[in-house]
């Protein structure tokens, strides 16, 4: 899990999802950029420059050891025993490779359709169906207890670790200690480090067996330590919430428990592909504008084959590639998956993979595959230029979030353009 809002699971988003699909993915693919949401999702984090040996200076490690000593004193006051600290922190050194990976962000990103090509590949669908068959009894019990469809749980398992194949081999405590010492997000990672020590102290796992991603996400479904403490469950009844073992039962149940506790509604889709009518008011295609499916149908918004979407509750229209490509009608369950990982691309990947595992068809509309997604530098330029001419994006951070989308839409309306909020290269060139 990859976001931290009010205790929600977190890890560096750029270290997630299709890292697990390394056998399908050629080297150097970089990151994925959802064109309308500006959230990068890494295919395979690569430390640049490649093949460089990172060596920690004696002075740097001495400062790390001094920090570690002060940290030990702080956490003793939080109830961590000397025995736990001795077992967990013995021999730790500053790992500069972890920091290099944390700093690694590709200048050029990949569009959502390339992300989905891997996230919902034929191989992943086949492996997911095999996993559903292998763990059918377990997943059926999990669905009965938590009310989360087994295909959704399997999709999370598939995107996080390729069904347990790539769970990460970095020592969690080593990684978190390094990241907590680093000043960039020190408080967040120190909180995670304390939680990891609490897990060890509770006896759920030994320090040696606590492994995962370089950013501290653990197990089959990649829980961060704080989220493990809040949401992990002992579904197999062996007395431990073991998300690290070869048996994925506890991890799968924990993912379902997490979604259930964040408001999952069984039987409600995360989203449905729709066809927009000619003359559709693109200014209404935004997350805070919701209607019932029947109300959308009255405006001509229907499924690709012309049917009305069943009334599953209030829904918004999401355009991942602006006015081109797939259009989605999204429901409250979309927000629930967002609690697991905040990137729209990830949510769509989970949702669409779960649909494919349940036997549904691929998206019917074509993506604008000829488009090039803006680079990080270009996204900042777009934000700067919009703000300078009175369409305030609220920040110049290279992330195309709701504020930037609204600014783009306002500019498009002012210019008589299609107001789809799509931050395209053509739009940037028009602003130059």
Specify the residue positions occupied by each region the protein language model found.
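Proline-rich, low-complexity linker regions of envelope-associated factors in Gram-negative bacteria
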Residues: 19-61, 362-364
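Positively charged n-region of N-terminal signal peptides that target proteins for export
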Residues: 1-3
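A general alpha-helix detector
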Residues: 67-71, 138, 175, 254, ...
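Mature N-terminal segment immediately following signal peptide/propeptide cleavage
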Residues: 55-89, 94
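Non-catalytic peripheral regions of nucleotide-handling enzymes
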Residues: 21, 382-385
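Catalytic glycan-binding domains that act on GlcNAc-containing polysaccharides
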Residues: 80-312, 325-329, 336-354, 358-376, ...
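Bacterial N-terminal signal peptides
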Residues: 6-16
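Short acidic, glycine/serine/threonine-rich helix-capping segments at coil-helix boundaries
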Residues: 374-379, 387-431
């Amino acid at each position: 899990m990859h976001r931290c809002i009010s205790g929600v699971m977190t890890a560096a988003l750029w270290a997630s999802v299709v890292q697990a699909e390394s056998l399908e993915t050629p080297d150097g693919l970089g990151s994925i950029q959802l064109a309308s949401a500006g959230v990068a999702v890494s295919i395979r984090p690569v430390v640049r420059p490649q093949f460089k040996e990172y060596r920690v200076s004696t002075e740097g490690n001495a400062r790390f050891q001094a920090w570690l000593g002060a940290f030990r004193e702080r956490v003793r006051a939080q109830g961590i025993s000397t025995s736990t600290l001795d077992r967990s922190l013995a021999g730790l050194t500053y790992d500069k490779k972890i920091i290099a990976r944390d700093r690694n962000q590709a200048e050029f990103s990949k569009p959502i359709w390339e992300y989905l090509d891997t996230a919902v590949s034929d191989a992943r669908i086949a492996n997911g169906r095999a996993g559903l068959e292998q763990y059918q009894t377990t997943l059926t019990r999990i669905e009965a207890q938590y009310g989360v469809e087994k295909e959704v749980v399997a999709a999370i398992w598939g995107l996080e670790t390729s069904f347990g194949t790539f769970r990460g081999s970095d020592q969690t405590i080593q990684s978190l200690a390094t990241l907590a010492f680093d000043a960039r997000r020190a408080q967040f990672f120190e909180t995670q480090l304390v939680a990891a020590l609490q897990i060890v102290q509770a006896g759920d796992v030994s320090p040696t067996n606590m492994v995962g991603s370089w950013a501290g996400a653990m197990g089959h479904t990649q829980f961060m330590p704080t989220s493990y403490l809040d949401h992990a469950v002992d579904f197999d009844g062996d007395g431990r919430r073991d998300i690290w073992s070869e048996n994925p039962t506890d991890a799968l149940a924990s993912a379902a428990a997490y979604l259930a506790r964040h408001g999952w509604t069984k039987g409600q889709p995360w989203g449905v592909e729709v066809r927009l009518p000619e003359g559709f008011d693109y200014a209404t295609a935004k997350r805070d504008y919701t209607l019932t499916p029947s109300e959308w149908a009255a405006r001509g918004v229907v499924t690709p084959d012309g049917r009305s979407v069943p009334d599953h509750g209030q829904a918004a229209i999401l355009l991942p590639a602006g006015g081109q490509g797939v259009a989605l009608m999204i429901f409250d369950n979309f927000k629930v998956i967002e609690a697991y990982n905040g990137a729209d691309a990830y949510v769509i990947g989970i949702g669409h993979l779960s649909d494919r595992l349940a036997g549904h068809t691929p998206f019917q509309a074509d993506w604008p595959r000829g488009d090039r997604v803006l680079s990080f530098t270009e996204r900042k330029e777009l934000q700067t230029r919009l703000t300078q001419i009175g369409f305030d994006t609220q920040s110049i951070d290279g992330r195309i979030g709701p504020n930037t989308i609204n600014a783009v839409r306002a500019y498009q309306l002012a210019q008589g353009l299609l107001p789809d909020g799509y931050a395209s290269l053509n739009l940037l060139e028009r602003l130059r």
